[in-house]
Amino acid sequence: MDTAGIRLTPKEIVSKLNEYIVGQNDAKRKVAIALRNRYRRSLLDEESKQEISPKNILMIGPTGVGKTEIARRMAKVVGAPFIKVEATKFTEVGYVGRDVESMVRDLVDVSVRLVKAQKKSLVQDEATAKANEKLVKLLVPSMKKKASQTNNPLESLFGGAIPNFGQNNEDEEEPPTEEIKTKRSEIKRQLEEGKLEKEKVRIKVEQDPGALGMLGTNQNQQMQEMMNQLMPKKKVEREVAVETARKILADSYADELIDQESANQEALELAEQMGIIFIDEIDKVATNNHNSGQDVSRQGVQRDILPILEGSVIQTKYGTVNTEHMLFIGAGAFHVSKPSDLIPELQGRFPIRVELDSLSVEDFVRILTEPKLSLIKQYEALLQTEEVTVNFTDEAITRLAEIAYQVNQDTDNIGARRLHTILEKMLEDLSFEAPSMPNAVVDITPQYVDDKLKSISTNKDLSAFIL
């Protein structure tokens, strides 16, 4: 697996995160150092490697300030498998809900997809060539061979009445005639020139055996997956366009061209050495009243999570995986509880603490304009597809930021997510009318913003429901 991104210096990682995330420099620095330490560990001898584990991170801050986005972008920068889970979805072993080991199995699934996608990209040209050959044969088929019933050694005992069920000649063809060869040559040329992309062709695709009803509980999920793998995959015929058929066939051939066992082993190692698990809402399982029944259950979840953070061997459908060197990032607002309300053993497993700042008006302005594909740029691009040009003035952007900040103060503080609701509401009429106003130019000014939002933003009751 190509993990060139892990060789980035902390400054380079922070620089890449700055392309997408505004502010929160302390959090960016700490995750960048954690990533760099992984690279440093990879350069050590085997004995030293085993002694050094990642320093897990606890992010503390209100919703919408960038906790998840920092972790997600960080994983993307280095090509590491990443999953986000919510601590509240887990329950103690023996209760209804997801068991904590499922987060590791989910991470391995992500890792397998990453590794196989990269390996498939290396054989893509060969797989596409095979797919094109198959398409030519499908578009200009030869005569099918008749099923052979003459070579069964038992037929002489039964007067030739026993057909040979052991052979399936369904897909075998007679040798192509000269006429068919000529037609195929012409079709191949047209395929290469892209002239047949919209033509329809019938192909056989594997049908997912589906879930087994009797194994629907989470505890039996792995058993269900194993059963699905053992069950024969039924093939069904579909009529699709040539361009779609090529993708389906190429993907199937790419699967055949890569070594599945080797890919699975590589994925397990990648998950072990580079995996990142983001545990959100960890504050919701913190306990500040140790007498209530609910808090006893929350403590149980914490104690179930603890062995995975300390290092456990988890069985997955691809093999066993050790969690000792995975990086865990816990996150929560900690409005009601405090990090010290977590059980002491779990607190000790998150040695790096970082507090994320609440967002100011200036932060909102930067979020609207600075990232690589900021919200303003996204809406401009979407409306441009309808040939409607939208221009936001600097004053209008500042006004939007002020309204978002004020609504957060007056109602629930949902951080940068408030900008999505504000922009959607402000541009609702324009988005609806855009198809009927081609070549229009719309200037978004402070007056435009106030006309669309002021009556709502100044009414706290309306803000709570609409924005």
From Swiss-Prot:
Single Gene Ontology MF annotation: peptidase activity
Ligand binding (ATP): 22, 64-69, 280, 345, 417
Superkingdom assignment: Bacteria
Places the protein is found: Cytoplasm
Positions of the UniProt region annotated as Disordered: 149-192
Gene3D superfamilies linked to this entry: 1.10.8.60, DNA helicase RuvA subunit, C-terminal domain (1.10.8.10), P-loop containing nucleotide triphosphate hydrolases (3.40.50.300)
Entry keyword set: ATP-binding, Chaperone, Cytoplasm, Nucleotide-binding, Stress response
One matching Pfam family: AAA_2
Main location: cytoplasm
An example Gene Ontology biological process: protein unfolding
GO cellular component entries: HslUV protease complex
Skewed-composition ranges (Basic and acidic residues): 178-192
Function in brief: ATPase subunit of a proteasome-like degradation complex; this subunit has chaperone activity. The binding of ATP and its subsequent hydrolysis by HslU are essential for unfolding of protein substrates subsequently hydrolyzed by HslV. HslU recognizes the N-terminal part of its protein substrates and unfolds these before they are guided to HslV for hydrolysis.
Subunit architecture: A double ring-shaped homohexamer of HslV is capped on each side by a ring-shaped HslU homohexamer. The assembly of the HslU/HslV complex is dependent on binding of ATP.
Record HAMAP family: HslU
NCBIfam families in the record: hslU, PRK05201.1
Record family assignment: Belongs to the ClpX chaperone family. HslU subfamily.
Protein name per its UniProtKB record: ATP-dependent protease ATPase subunit HslU
Annotated source species: Staphylococcus aureus (strain NCTC 8325 / PS 47)
